[in-house]
A protein has these predicted regions:
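Extended lipid/amphipathic-ligand handling interfaces
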Residues: 2-4, 14-24, 30-35, 40-63, ...
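Low-complexity, polar/charged sequence tracts that form flexible coils or short amphipathic helices
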Residues: 10-11
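Gram-negative outer-membrane beta-barrel proteins
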Residues: 52, 67-75, 106, 118, ...
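Extracytoplasmic loops and strand-loop junctions of Gram-negative outer membrane beta-barrel proteins
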Residues: 77-80, 154-156
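Extended hydrophobic/Leu-rich segments
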Residues: 143, 148-151, 160-163
């Protein structure tokens, strides 16, 4: 277990877990990160050959967590005070599940949700991730927005009266 407080304001209350690694694989049964406002739990298993030039092995990763307002604002950095004040005091809920290797990676779950503001869901498959020329993929995307009034503050005081952000829906693949 570890604890730290960084000059930027990031405070890690605890980072706990364990991993096993040998010459062929890495196993992280559980790794938990806690800050005063956030909680993230990850699990991963990886054959080291999954990231080789000719990927053979498999990897799997799971992430679940909640990113609190203070941590979101800290990582975003330099946001206008009006946005900081207007941003909802709710955590961003995250879920991720992926399996495969650098040749073929299946995204079975990608979710991000901020209560009352938005919900994003995606899944898909990506191919040849390490090949900048032949990289490809197919992702199904579903985004629902609700009250995004807090985002209007990013446009500045003058533009606030001219911007409307109604609830929206975006579906794509």
């Amino acid at each position: 277990e570890t604890h730290m407080k960084e000059k930027s304001g990031l405070e890690i209350r605890s980072l706990t877990g364990h991993f096993n690694m040998d010459s062929t694989s890495l196993h992280v049964p559980e790794l938990v990160l806690r800050t005063p406002d956030s909680y993230i739990r990850t699990q991963a298993d990886m054959d080291l050959s999954a990231v080789a030039e000719q990927p053979q092995g498999k990897m799997s990763a799971r992430l679940m967590g909640e990113l609190g307002k203070q941590d979101v604002l800290l990582f975003a950095g330099g946001l206008p005070p009006a946005f900081v004040k207007a941003y909802p005091n709710s955590p961003v809920i995250l879920r991720l599940s992926a399996d495969g290797n650098l040749d073929t990676l299946n995204l079975t779950t990608v979710e991000a949700r901020l209560a009352g503001a938005f919900e994003l869901k995606a899944d898909g498959k990506m191919f040849r991730l390490a090949d900048s020329v032949r990289r490809s993929g197919h992702v199904n995307l579903n985004l629902r927005t609700r009250n995004l009034d807090f985002a209007r503050a990013l446009a500045g005081e003058e533009a606030l009266k001219d911007i409307a952000l109604p609830p929206m829906r975006l579906d794509g693949n």
